[in-house]
């Protein structure tokens, strides 16, 4: 890339200040993402390790690539040694390629989670995700190695002003652009199109599925022991479920939480059309598990963790439960403890309802997280497409289609800006990341989840 006239002092200061802010914001934001995933219970799903690796790649761009690109841009020539130029170019391709291959892997993970939920979620373990991440980095390394092995034609070198540029041969430009950007983009578009079709087909079957397993929406289970189930709806359970529809926080059907028995997995939740017993004294909002009013100020920041501590669990009837006053229960029944009350379970109805509820909540979480990742992928493509398009166009018809230097540099830096945008996207579109960021910034962080 030939450089134009040097920038004025004012322009140099403005550009340096803006890029320095970009570097600091990228490091801070992506470090926050890594801490959030590693320390937040609501973000400890194995697939979120993809986001940790992606954030690490963005931090490496901000620390090893952008500062030297800034110096090269402002000085108009490569100030550093020739060996570092070759390493710098290879790392630039490596980190950019790893970012888009990460997104491609995330897209495939989303597709398998939506299309083969039961089969795939049982195999979606941290070890398996880490193996996929390692494969992603190996693919990126293979694509980035040619500049180190084959120097090729780097164009004329001005006297006294060394330049640091990639191989200028058309075959390499086209091959690297296809391997680093266009091919992964095509895969992601096809995968997300398939996910959209699956979701559309699922929505068409929605009215049949909303009534629960094997029953319509209007059907109510018969009371056990003379009216054990009241006629009221289950707002508390619905609110817990909606609060837990978070960023991919789904467990496989074969997994259990600590302290959870096989019997609990079948009786811990009910479809929303089933009924709840009114809980006396619970009409207005209180601190979770009878917390004192002083603790309510912290409740908003730790809502997810508190809900997990008191999430719906089927427990044997006893004189008092963990989260509510004692109630008189029919013999042989079980009670479902929730944040705002109790639900009495008749005999034999918990297993089917629990499986239905967990399956439906899992699908909802997958759909919401898929939307967030679609935004991440869309922003990435918007940021990098102008650069790769103009870069490839210059190789196809270098004399008549070459983009002006200033515009090409603008596209170049817009691509780098993408490294700072993912934390912003997570904050805007995902409440779990918002809560995790708030907790990290306002109090000491806790033990990592892995």
Curated annotation (Swiss-Prot):
Residues 1-12, 70-86, 150-172, 390-405 are extracellular. PROSITE patterns: G_PROTEIN_RECEP_F1_1 (PS00237), G_PROTEIN_RECEP_F1_2 (PS50262). The record marks 92 as: Implicated in ligand binding. The chain crosses the membrane at residues 13-38, 49-69, 87-107, 129-149, 173-193, 369-389, 406-426. Residues 312-326 have a biased composition (Low complexity). Disulfide bonds join 85-164. InterPro entries: ADR_fam, ADRA2B_rcpt, GPCR_Rhodpsn, GPCR_Rhodpsn_7TM. Residues 246-256 have a biased composition (Basic and acidic residues). It is a multi-pass membrane protein. Residues 39-48, 108-128, 194-368, 427-450 are cytoplasmic. Residues 293-311 have a biased composition (Acidic residues). The record marks 176, 180 as: Implicated in catechol agonist binding. GO terms for molecular function: alpha2-adrenergic receptor activity; epinephrine binding. Pfam families: 7tm_1 (PF00001). Residues 204-229, 241-329 are annotated as: Disordered. Gene3D superfamilies: Rhodopsin 7-helix transmembrane proteins. One of its GO terms (cellular component) is plasma membrane. GO terms for biological process: adrenergic receptor signaling pathway; cell-cell signaling; female pregnancy; G protein-coupled receptor signaling pathway; negative regulation of epinephrine secretion; negative regulation of norepinephrine secretion; platelet activation; positive regulation of blood pressure. It is found in: Cell membrane. Interacts with RAB26. Interacts with PPP1R9B. Interacts with GGA1, GGA2 and GGA3. Belongs to the G-protein coupled receptor 1 family. Adrenergic receptor subfamily. ADRA2B sub-subfamily. It is linked to Epilepsy, familial adult myoclonic, 2: A form of familial myoclonic epilepsy, a neurologic disorder characterized by cortical hand tremors, myoclonic jerks and occasional generalized or focal seizures with a non-progressive or very slowly progressive disease course. Usually, myoclonic tremor is the presenting symptom, characterized by tremulous finger movements and myoclonic jerks of the limbs increased by action and posture. In a minority of patients, seizures are the presenting symptom. Some patients exhibit mild cognitive impairment. FAME2 inheritance is autosomal dominant. This is Alpha-2B adrenergic receptor. The lineage of its organism: Eukaryota, Metazoa, Chordata, Craniata, Vertebrata.
């Amino acid at each position: 890339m030939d450089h134009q006239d040097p920038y004025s002092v004012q322009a140099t200061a403005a550009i340096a200040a803006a890029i320095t802010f970009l570097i600091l914001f990228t490091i801070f934001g992506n470090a926050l993402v890594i801490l959030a995933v590693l320390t937040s219970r609501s973000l400890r799903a194995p697939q979120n390790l993809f986001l940790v690796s992606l954030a690490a790649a963005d931090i490496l761009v901000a620390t090893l690539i952008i500062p030297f690109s800034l110096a090269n841009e402002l000085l108009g020539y490569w100030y550093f040694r020739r060996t570092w130029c070759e390493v710098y170019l290879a790392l630039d391709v490596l980190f950019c390629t790893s970012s888009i291959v990460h997104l491609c892997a995330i897209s495939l993970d989303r597709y398998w989670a939506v299309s083969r939920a039961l089969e795939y979620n049982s195999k979606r373990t941290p070890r398996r995700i880490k193996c996929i991440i390692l494969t992603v980095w190996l693919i990126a390394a293979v694509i980035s190695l040619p500049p180190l092995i084959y120097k090729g034609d780097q164009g004329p070198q001005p006297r006294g002003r060394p330049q640091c540029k990639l191989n200028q041969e058309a075959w390499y430009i086209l091959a690297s652009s296809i391997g680093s950007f266009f091919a992964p983009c095509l895969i992601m578009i096809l995968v997300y199109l398939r996910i959209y079709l699956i979701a559309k087909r699922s929505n068409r079957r929605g009215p049949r599925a909303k009534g629960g397993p094997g029953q319509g929406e209007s059907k109510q289970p018969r009371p056990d022991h003379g009216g054990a189930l009241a006629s009221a709806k289950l707002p508390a359970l619905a609110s817990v479920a909606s609060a837990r529809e978070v960023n991919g926080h789904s467990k496989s059907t074969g997994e259990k939480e600590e302290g959870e028995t096989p019997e609990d997995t079948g009786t811990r939740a009910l479809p929303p059309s089933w009924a709840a017993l009114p809980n006396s004294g619970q009409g207005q909002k209180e601190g979770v598990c009878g917390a004192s009013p002083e603790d309510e100020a912290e409740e908003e920041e730790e809502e997810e963790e508190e809900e997990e501590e008191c999430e719906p669990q089927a427990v044997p009837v006893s004189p008092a439960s963990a989260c509510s006053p004692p109630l008189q229960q029919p013999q042989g029944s079980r009670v479902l403890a929730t944040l705002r009350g109790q639900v009495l379970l008749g005999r034999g109805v918990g297993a089917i309802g629990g499986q239905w509820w967990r399956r439906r909540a899992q699908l909802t979480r997958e759909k919401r997280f898929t939307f967030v990742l679609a935004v991440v992928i869309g922003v990435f493509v918007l940021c990098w497409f102008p650069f790769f398009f103009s870069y490839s166009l210059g190789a196809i018809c270098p004399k008549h289609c070459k983009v002006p230097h200033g515009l090409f540099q603008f596209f170049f830096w817009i691509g780098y800006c993408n490294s700072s945008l993912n934390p912003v996207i997570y904050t805007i579109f995902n409440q779990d990341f918002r809560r995790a960021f708030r907790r990290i910034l306002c109090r000491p962080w806790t033990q990592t989840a892995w």
